[in-house]
């Protein structure tokens, strides 16, 4: 499933998972990966300042794959703002997001069109959630979708901490021609 979703080889996924496990970022187990059990459940603001250099590298890598003029969905999560910052110099982007922080960052680029889903603002992580945000997705198709995840199940299914976030991401992935997981 990940091979198809990420459009990379099984060897690439295996190598990346081994690297993440060796650096205690993820915990590898038979048939899948998950959150390192030694990892504390930190607040969003605490997670924002963790691994900043890695998040900027991820942002630069993803931004290098996005052409000018693309339509992009950007999910919620602490890696999404560095990705948005890496996209600031692109021109003609159309951004669809449920992340207020991403919208504010990309609003610095006057050549960027930003579409924000409606719904309830969840202040702890700057996310817009709710049924109206899911309905919003049915009206927008994008070339690229950029997603954050909580973990990966044994069967390769991408998981999140909140079922509403997982449901929203599932709809957004269906609306995206190409997906990136960050």
Language-model segments: residues:
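A residue-level structural signature of the nucleotidyltransferase/glycosyltransferase Rossmann-like core
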Residues: 94-95, 144
């Amino acid at each position: 499933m990940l091979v198809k979703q990420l459009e990379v080889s099984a060897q690439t996924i295996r190598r990346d998972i081994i690297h993440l496990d060796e650096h205690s970022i993820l915990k590898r187990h038979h048939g899948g990966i998950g959150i390192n059990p030694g990892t504390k459940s930190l607040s969003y603001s605490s997670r924002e300042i963790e691994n900043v250099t890695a998040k900027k590298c991820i942002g630069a890598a993803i931004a290098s794959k996005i052409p000018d003029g693309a339509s992009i969905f950007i999910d919620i999560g602490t890696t999404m703002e560095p990705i948005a910052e890496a996209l600031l110099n692109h021109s003609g982007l159309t951004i669809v997001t449920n992340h207020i922080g991403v919208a504010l960052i990309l609003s610095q680029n006057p050549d960027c069109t930003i579409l924000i889903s409606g719904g309830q603002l969840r202040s702890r992580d700057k996310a817009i959630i709710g049924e109206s945000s899911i309905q919003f997705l049915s009206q927008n198709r994008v070339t690229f979708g950029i997603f954050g995840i909580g973990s990966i199940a044994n069967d390769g299914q991408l998981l999140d901490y909140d079922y509403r976030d997982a449901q929203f991401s599932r709809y957004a992935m269906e609306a995206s021609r190409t997906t990136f997981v960050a």
